[in-house]
Amino acid sequence: MNKKLIVGNWKMNSTFSTTKEFLKEFQSLYSLNSKTYNQKATFAVATPFTNLAALKDNDLNLKLAAQNMSFYEKGAYTGEVSADMLLDLNVSYVILGHSEQRQYHAETDENVNKKARLALEKNLTPIVCVGETLEEYLAGKTKEVVKAQLAASLKDLDVTKVIVAYEPIWAIGTGKVATAQIAQDVCKYIKELTSKQTVVQYGGSVNAKNIFELSSQEDIDGFLVGGASLKATDFSDLMLNLK
């Protein structure tokens, strides 16, 4: 059985206190389901920066991810968070180039590339997000957009050490989900552009009801999950319902 990589992206949700409540609830679920979880998945949550410390020393095999990081190592960059700060909190993964960062904070492929390069130097695993808008999808430009984003974001990087998350923008938080075949086709294309060894996730309204069919696809190695990861019971159901 190939284990899937499940990363819950909490976005700007939850507080330090509610994160501790999540951990307590997940601890109870883990005691019942740990064998299944660990057989089927590697699992992590990307909490807001302020909540990472609440999960730092968990003994549940629950890995930590950050939602962004700076491409500067340290210095007078108010509001930025460095790779070393993340490492000190036992963070394993960092999400880069999420469509919401691109939309609201003018994130560019070039900056994603600089961040990913630094992450790899620091032994953090970057999760580089790519995906098309609804307009681009309807115009048949999905692969064209994804190819351009990957070319710039992964320039001169070891693609076998980078995780790529395909998140069609039209499916993020909308309740719309790409069909399993669409997701499979694009994830397969990403592997063709990068490497068969590159881990490719799908993200976009993934939940416990559709994850079985999606996880049955040959080239989908995991999932970047939003709202369905905020509650411990929902997060648990994701792993239990994997193929």
Swiss-Prot record:
It comes from the Bacteria. CDD domains: TIM (cd00311). It is found in: Cytoplasm. Keywords: Cytoplasm, Gluconeogenesis, Glycolysis, Isomerase. Disulfide bonds: none annotated. Its EC number is 5.3.1.1. Its main location: cytoplasm. GO terms for cellular component: cytosol. GO terms for biological process: gluconeogenesis; glyceraldehyde-3-phosphate biosynthetic process; glycerol catabolic process; glycolytic process. It catalyses: D-glyceraldehyde 3-phosphate = dihydroxyacetone phosphate. Substrate binds at residues 9-11, 173, 205, 226-227. The keyword Cytoplasm applies. Pathway: Carbohydrate biosynthesis; gluconeogenesis; Carbohydrate degradation; glycolysis; D-glyceraldehyde 3-phosphate from glycerone phosphate: step 1/1. The active site is at residues 98, 167. The keyword Transmembrane helix does not apply. One of its GO terms (molecular function) is triose-phosphate isomerase activity. Belongs to the triosephosphate isomerase family. PANTHER family: TRIOSEPHOSPHATE ISOMERASE. Involved in the gluconeogenesis. Catalyzes stereospecifically the conversion of dihydroxyacetone phosphate (DHAP) to D-glyceraldehyde-3-phosphate (G3P). Homodimer. This is Triosephosphate isomerase. It comes from Mycoplasmopsis synoviae (strain 53).
